[in-house]
Amino acid sequence: MSTSPTLVFTSSDGVDITVDRDVAERSLLIKNMLEDLGETGEAIPIPNVNEAVLKKVIEWCTHHKNDPPSTGDDDDSRRKTTDIDEWDQKFMQVDQEMLFEIILAANYLDIKGLLDVGCKTVANMIKGKSPEEIRKTFNIQNDFTPEEEDQIRRENEWAEE
């Protein structure tokens, strides 16, 4: 049983979800809001995040609630690697739509660690792939004419060496 006080979030689809405050404060948006406004006891609306995504975000925050807060010093080393720990890799084994919704929610809620894991997951999905393979992976239509594509390839030959 948790001894942390709880908060209630209301998802964009109107579902109330109870969350331990220490878990909720993995979100800098929520942490700063609570510091500025205090605890009102009312449900906190999370207008950009539906129930399924919010539950996934809370699951990640619960697993990482004891992680040290990230500092500015971590930023450079964090960005230089696409390594993801095993639990996070399993957590991110979701369909593409859910993956992108988690990334958007992490950005909106200002949860840097989760945003990093989501972005690294996408980076690993495209690493070493050709533009055609990337388009296929993400179901992206090619809007270049063959002439434009040839010109781009010629201009960027140096990148393929």
UniProtKB/Swiss-Prot annotation:
Coiled coil: none annotated. It comes from the Eukaryota. It holds the Pfam family Skp1_POZ. Pathway: Protein modification; protein ubiquitination. Keywords: Ubl conjugation pathway. Residues 103-161 are annotated as: Interaction with the F-box domain of F-box proteins. GO terms for biological process: exit from mitosis; G1/S transition of mitotic cell cycle; G2/M transition of mitotic cell cycle; kinetochore assembly; mitotic nuclear membrane biogenesis; negative regulation of cytoplasmic translation; negative regulation of mitotic metaphase/anaphase transition; positive regulation of D-glucose transmembrane transport. InterPro entries: SKP1 (IPR016897), SKP1-like (IPR001232), SKP1-like_dim_sf (IPR036296), SKP1/BTB/POZ_sf (IPR011333), Skp1_comp_dimer (IPR016072), Skp1_comp_POZ (IPR016073). SUPFAM superfamilies: POZ domain, Skp1 dimerisation domain-like. One of its GO terms (molecular function) is ubiquitin protein ligase activity. GO terms for cellular component: CBF3 complex; kinetochore; nuclear SCF ubiquitin ligase complex; RAVE complex; single-stranded DNA-dependent ATP-dependent DNA helicase complex. Component of the SCF (SKP1-CUL1-F-box protein) E3 ubiquitin ligase complexes. Essential component of the SCF (SKP1-CUL1-F-box protein) E3 ubiquitin ligase complexes, which mediate the ubiquitination and subsequent proteasomal degradation of target proteins. Controls sulfur metabolite repression, probably by mediating the inactivation or degradation of the metR transcription factor. Belongs to the SKP1 family. This is E3 ubiquitin ligase complex SCF subunit sconC. It comes from Aspergillus terreus (strain NIH 2624 / FGSC A1156).
